[in-house]
Amino acid sequence: MPRRRVVGQRKILPDPKFGSELLAKFINVVMVDGKKSVSESIVYGALEIIANKSGKDHLATFEGALDNIRPNVEVKSRRVGGSTYQVPVEVRPVRRNALAMRWLVEAARKRGEKSMAQRLAGELLDAADNKGSAVKKREDVHRMAEANKAFAHYRW
């Protein structure tokens, strides 16, 4: 942590095709080994597949899917007097987006379709319908927070 001043968060440039900052961030999350053009083709391919399959607006489907994956609360470990408690805490908006994108990509990578674009499209469509592994992950995190609600007074 800097001693002098708090460093502001960098603004990310919107993606060239749709002009969405959220989509640009997602492209960066999908990216592996700095190959941005590959990740762009994967994400744009997935959005194309969504447009063909569902017939709905692909950008709206993407944002709806992210809304269904974003966690509201999570648990953090807190050590109190020799024992560790899982303390439920609210998730900040930036982290909420980051977790949703990370879980979405992880869930897509575990799927069985042929190409990554197809896996991503499938997971996005499932998430838009409140199904799929990424939504299940969010439900598990919420369930964990609910189970540990008794330790909420240990919040810092």
Swiss-Prot record:
Ribosomal protein keyword on record: yes
InterPro entries hit by this protein: Ribosomal_uS7 (IPR000235), Ribosomal_uS7_bac/org-type (IPR005717), Ribosomal_uS7_CS (IPR020606), Ribosomal_uS7_dom (IPR023798), Ribosomal_uS7_dom_sf (IPR036823)
A GO molecular function held by the record: structural constituent of ribosome
One GO CC term on file: small ribosomal subunit
Stored CDD domains: uS7_Bacteria (cd14869)
Superkingdom field: Bacteria
Keywords tagged on the record: Ribonucleoprotein, Ribosomal protein, RNA-binding, rRNA-binding, tRNA-binding
A Pfam family it matches: Ribosomal_S7
Gene3D superfamilies referenced in this protein's UniProt entry, alphabetically: Ribosomal protein S7 domain (1.10.455.10)
PANTHER family, per database record: RIBOSOMAL PROTEIN S7
Family: Belongs to the universal ribosomal protein uS7 family.
Function: One of the primary rRNA binding proteins, it binds directly to 16S rRNA where it nucleates assembly of the head domain of the 30S subunit. Is located at the subunit interface close to the decoding center, probably blocks exit of the E-site tRNA.
Name of the protein described by the UniProt record: Small ribosomal subunit protein uS7
